[in-house]
Amino acid sequence: MEVVLKPILQNIVRKHGYKIFFQKKFSVVESLKGRVPASLANRKTDFIIASNKKFVNIEVNYYAGPGSKPEEIVDSYINRKKELEANGWSFIWITDGNVWKTSKNQLIKAFNELECIFNLEFVRRGLLSEALLRILA
């Protein structure tokens, strides 16, 4: 799914003058004077978008079928969001796939805890771009 989103994010970044980091460790933003939680510094992220010392972690996942992974990811991303927000970051999760038709409780849990969750259709309609404009303004 990163392959699908990378060109979309590159267009948003180019249009608004943001910086993008793809498949980098969180510590990459230390060069931009960003605060990085110690527990995340050496972890890789799908995307980081940066502008004016504001940072957004974007994680993307596609799940074709049921399993324990989507449940673990929801809990993990809720915890990550809290840790990032404590350090001045924002968090966006882009997820899609048939698993969410049968894992509605986990999806509801995610919507109750995470402000920015999008599927591919929402991204294509421009909601990700709007969210980034609001967050990075």
Give the positions of each predicted feature:
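Domain-level recognition of nuclease-like catalytic cores that cleave nucleotide substrates
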Residues: 94-137
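Active-site metal-binding core of divalent-cation-utilizing nuclease and nuclease-like domains
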Residues: 21-52
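Structural alpha-beta junctions
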Residues: 14-18, 84-90, 112-118
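Acidic-basic catalytic patches of nuclease active cores, encompassing PD-(D/E)XK
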Residues: 1-33
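Hydrophobic, Leu/Ile/Phe/Ala-enriched alpha-helical segments that form helix-helix packing faces
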Residues: 5-13, 80-85, 136
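Conserved catalytic cores of phosphodiester-cleaving nucleases, focusing on short active-site segments
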Residues: 47-51, 56-64, 77
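Catalytic cores of nucleic-acid endonucleases
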Residues: 62-105
